[in-house]
Amino acid sequence: MTQLHIAARSVELSALTKRFGRTTAVDGIDLALDGGVVGLLGPNGAGKTTLLRMLATVLAPDAGSLRLLGLDPARPDERLELRRRLGYLPQAPALYGSFTALELVDYVAVLKEHTDRDRRAQECTRVLDLVGLGDRRNSRIRALSGGMRQRVALAAALLGSPDLLVLDEPATGLDPEQRLELRSLLADTATRGTVVLSTHNTAEVAALCQRVVVVTAGSVRFEGTPAELRGLAEGRVWESPIADPRATRSWMTADGAFRNLGDLPAGVAPSPATLDDGYFLAVRSGR
Ligand SMILES: Nc1ncnc2c1ncn2[C@@H]1O[C@H](COP(=O)(O)OP(=O)(O)OP(=O)(O)O)[C@@H](O)[C@H]1O
């Protein structure tokens, strides 16, 4: 008889919940992700960082369960293995200013138990080269620009080619060229594992993500491909010289015309929808 192997998903969340006092930051999220780059979109305070911190095992849920790479982070033995196979870039990484870029990355490598000294040195050099900081490896963190510091933290997250890479607004502070580099770096990582990132930039999602999850008030409002998110707004967008009062939302565009979102009025021709339009609709559906 053929043995049926069902591979563990990279991320499996069931009724995942996290509260801070009276605030429910993550409110019973069910989600299964496996492979590729997944973009997490949502307004300020939606719960993205809280969710990512739980995926990175730095925060434990109050209720519900999560399995990451088939492992249970609540179990100390499984958590250790998981942390070796996980990379995390926090939202505002606190870096020791007096360390050099190399010392900082090496320190994280030690914490991740890369015990072989020579291999650790090679790995640190590799990840610093990957983020384009090979020539600044001996610069002190405090002497680096904001974007370079972000790249040092990214290098630390890439140590050991993680199977699950969790990135909180990774493009913050990067210039356009560095953003392009980041995209190819993450696309490459996603060929071997799963990348989950938060962003406020729908263009980033369109360029990089195979899947997108829209979160508001701690709940998932949409999960699907970027094309499906855009599709939500297809036939629900139109332009006009002044804001149309029939729209649920209107805003002025760069050319001075108004873009309207809502039920298309009779006799009005729809405009092609964008990912932003789909995002606005997904966010509003939760209100
Ligand atoms: N450590 C904490 N203590 C108390 N409240 C918190 C804490 N962390 C988050 N919160 C609250 O939980 C909610 C979700 O916050 P979170 O940082 O996860 O949102 P976010 O989607 O990442 O926001 P942003 O886009 O602004 O980064 C917010 O209401 C926030 O104030």
What are these regions (language model features)?
Residues 180-260:
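ABC transporter nucleotide-binding domain
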Residues 159-163:
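A short, proline-enriched helix->beta-strand linker immediately N-terminal to the Walker B motif
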Residues 165-169, 174:
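Catalytic Walker B motif of ABC-type/P-loop ATPase nucleotide-binding domains
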Residues 11, 25-28, 83:
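Conserved structural motif at the start of ABC-family nucleotide-binding domains
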Residues 106, 110, 118-136:
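Conserved ABC ATPase "signature" region
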Residues 43-47:
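Walker A (P-loop) phosphate-binding loop of ABC-type ATPase nucleotide-binding domains
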Residues 64-75, 81-82:
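Conserved ABC transporter NBD signature motif
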